[in-house]
UniProtKB/Swiss-Prot annotation:
Family membership: Belongs to the TRAFAC class translation factor GTPase superfamily. Classic translation factor GTPase family. LepA subfamily.
Lineage: Bacteria, Bacillati, Cyanobacteriota, Cyanophyceae, Oscillatoriophycideae
Gene responsible for this protein: lepA
Gene3D superfamilies in the record: 3.30.70.240, Elongation factor 4, C-terminal domain, Elongation Factor G (Translational Gtpase), domain 3, P-loop containing nucleotide triphosphate hydrolases, Translation factors
Organism (species): Gloeothece citriformis (strain PCC 7424) (Cyanothece sp. (strain PCC 7424))
Membrane topology per record: Peripheral membrane protein
Subcellular location, principal: membrane
Enzyme Commission code(s) on record: 3.6.5.n1
The reaction(s) this protein catalyses: GTP + H2O = GDP + phosphate + H(+)
Name of the molecule in the record: Elongation factor 4
GO terms for MF: GTP binding; GTPase activity; ribosome binding
Record-annotated disulphide pairs: none
Keywords: Cell inner membrane, Cell membrane, GTP-binding, Hydrolase, Membrane, Nucleotide-binding, Protein biosynthesis
Pfam families named in the record: EFG_C, GTP_EFTU, GTP_EFTU_D2, LepA_C
PROSITE patterns, sorted: G_TR_1 (PS00301), G_TR_2 (PS51722)
Length: 604
């Protein structure tokens, strides 16, 4: 592609917590190397989705090739492979780190090291990356570079004697960063003469060209027109277009080991070109794929229903379009007696779920109701069969199951010392098991807990932030399944079960949850002409009950004094009418009632 030898290519990524200035630093590097002209520059150039700019997070990975003339007069090619900084996307982070030889560890000089950064640093160390620490935002009045540098040394174990002090916003220290990438990050191995192996680290759907795949060539050479094989999916394609990202796409004829680029080959969906898959030549395939490929498995499920049943088709089309770009999104049709037709969707985690919902509402103009998120339970039935259940309505009845297991996570929280008590209480309330506590510096502490995933999917993150005034950060990963005393809690309104309100809870919590939910529904369901009972039940046993009194007309208004039998007759007639109405009447459960389930955990 270029006349730059492999020894002058540097592939690196930026590791940083949300809001520590990663996208701004990338902007400055693009500007200083002349990759993007000043007049075309806009804030957060590499964040494509509007939602990313608003939330200040990177969702889809981006890559940019920069040509840089170093102080030694040599021309270098720097490939920046951007990573998402959020816990839900840690697999994507691990793949983009595998495509690099070095990483910039960017830490906000006023905030210090956060849990998510730490998790990504461990990923980088596993991939044997050269890590260059950078203190960002040193121009802020609250910056404490010495304290934070000491923190990085103690927590991460990096030598910070030559730490770079920078302010991406002001452009301070960016040249130093570019020089240190050239001198400290090792060049890729020169394996141009081996069989082709390239790592996919991202892909997106383009309506004209099909799926566009971003990849890093690990071994060998790839040319335009080559027939390639994707080793995990086993599919073959012919490369129609090959190029580099600078950050805009520039077509080239060939790319060799160490380079980063993109190709289009009329691939239909992103699922066919999964992140982490290995590209090799179909006529001469490599012996084995690159290590580390994993299928993206959804962890959190919820039901999505259109408020207007006419929008069902629109919702289906919108989900199909989003899935073209998001291989981790799963969905299947679902019907609910209370909500009509909709979809059961699977997500990587909570942030992923929120982003998908927000994109559906914003980009496709849909009005949606969501049910409470649930996780995947493993149920062993009396026939010794193990089934996976992501929807409470699929749970076999108690007499047909031996045990229910739920997923557990290992969670690490980093918090200022003053909030340790509040966080421990939060974890205790969520059935957490205390594992470890480490003091990093005088003021910062790490808490390690093992918790059921179901307890953190609703609002754990919000609670963590509100109890620590936004100072704590968390990181979690799955550690497996454990058996627990779990039961299905059914909610019945006027004797009919409302499937969208059913949930799987721990037996010890069932009474409190049932009690709180029936009280909440009593406030939210409007009064009808007949008395409406609301019950929470486990199997056939009712554990909590409320009732909404009937609206009644005063039928005795016309009777002045006079005969008691006349009044009795009128009251009995009214009662008979109410009874008949109750047997055939239906109760409208408003949308707020379904939202109440989501908010319920805040109080419990």
């Amino acid at each position: 592609m270029t006349d730059v030898p492999v020894s002058r290519i540097r592939n690196f990524s930026i590791i940083a917590h949300i809001d520590h200035g990663k996208s701004t630093l990338a902007d400055r590097m693009l500007q200083m190397t002349g990759t993007v002209e000043d007049r075309k520059m806009k804030e957060q150039f590499l964040d494509n989705l509007d939602l990313e700019r608003e939330r200040g997070i990177t969702i889809k990975l981006q890559a940019a090739r920069m040509n840089y003339t170093a102080q030694d007069g040599q021309h270098y090619v720097l490939n920046l492979i951007d990573t998402p900084g959020h816990v839900d996307f840690s697999y994507e982070v691990s793949r983009s780190l595998a495509a690099c030889e070095g990483a910039l560890l960017v830490v906000d000089a006023s905030q210090g090291v956060e849990a998510q950064t730490l998790a990504n640093v461990y990923l980088a160390l596993e991939n044997n990356l050269e890590i260059i620490p950078v203190l960002n935002k040193i121009d802020l009045p609250g910056a404490e570079p010495e304290r934070v540098a000491q923190e990085i040394e103690e927590i991460v174990g990096l030598d910070c004697s030559g730490i770079i002090k920078a302010s991406a916003k002001e452009g301070i220290g960016v040249n130093e960063i570019l020089e240190s990438i050239v001198h400290l990050v090792p060049p890729p191995d020169d394996t141009t003469n081996k069989p082709l192996r390239a790592l996919i680290f991202d892909s997106y759907y383009d309506s004209y060209r099909g799926v566009v795949v971003y990849f890093r060539v690990m071994d060998g050479t790839v040319k335009k027109g080559d027939r390639v094989l994707l080793m995990a999916s086993g599919k073959e394609y012919e490369i129609d277009e090959l190029g580099v990202l600078s950050p805009h796409q520039i077509q080239v004829d060939e790319l060799h080991a160490g380079e980063v680029g993109y190709f289009a080959a009329a691939i239909k969906t992103v699922e066919d070109a999964r992140v982490g898959d290995t590209i090799t030549l179909a006529p001469k395939p490599a012996d084995e794929p690159l290590p580390g490929y994993k299928e993206a498995k959804p962890m959190v499920f919820c039901g999505l229903f259109p408020t207007d049943s006419d929008q069902y088709e629109d919702l289906r089309d919108a989900l199909h379009k989003l899935k073209l770009n998001d291989a981790a999104l799963n969905f299947e049709p679902e019907t609910s007696t209370a909500m009509g037709f909709g979809f059961r969707c699977g997500f990587l985690g909570l942030l992923h779920m929120e982003i998908v919902q927000e994109r559906l509402e914003r980009e496709y103009d849909l009005d949606l109701i969501t049910t409470a998120p649930s996780v995947v339970y493993r149920v062993t039935t009396t026939e010794e069969e193990v089934i996976e259940v992501d929807n409470p309505s699929q749970l076999p009845p108690p007499q047909k199951r031996i045990k229910i297991e739920e997923p557990y996570v290992h969670m690490e929280m980093i918090t200022p010392e003053t909030y340790v008590g509040a966080l421990m209480e939060l974890c205790q309330n969520r059935r957490g098991e205390f594992k470890d506590m480490r003091y990093f510096t005088q003021t910062r502490t790490a808490l390690v807990y093992e918790l059921p995933l179901a307890e953190i999917v609703t609002d754990f993150f919000d609670q963590l932030k509100s109890r620590t005034r936004g100072y704590a950060s968390m990181e979690y990963h799955l550690i497996g399944y454990r058996e627990n005393a779990l039961v299905k809690l059914d909610i019945m309104v006027n004797g009919d079960g409302v499937d969208a309100l059913a949930m799987i809870v721990h037996r010890d919590k069932a009474y409190n949850v049932g009690r709180a939910l029936t009280e909440k529904l009593k406030e939210l369901i409007p009064r009808h002409q007949f008395k409406v009972p609301i019950q929470a039940a486990i199997g056939s046993k009712v554990i909590a009950s409320e009732h909404i009194p009937a609206l009644r007309k005063d039928v005795l208004a016309k009777c002045y004094g006079g005969d008691i039998t006349r009044k009795k007759k009128l009251l009995e007639k009214q009662a008979k009418g109410k009874k008949r109405m109750k047997s055939i009447g239906t109760v409208d459960v408003p949308q707020e009632a379904f939202m109440a389930v989501l908010r319920l955990n805040n109080e419990s």
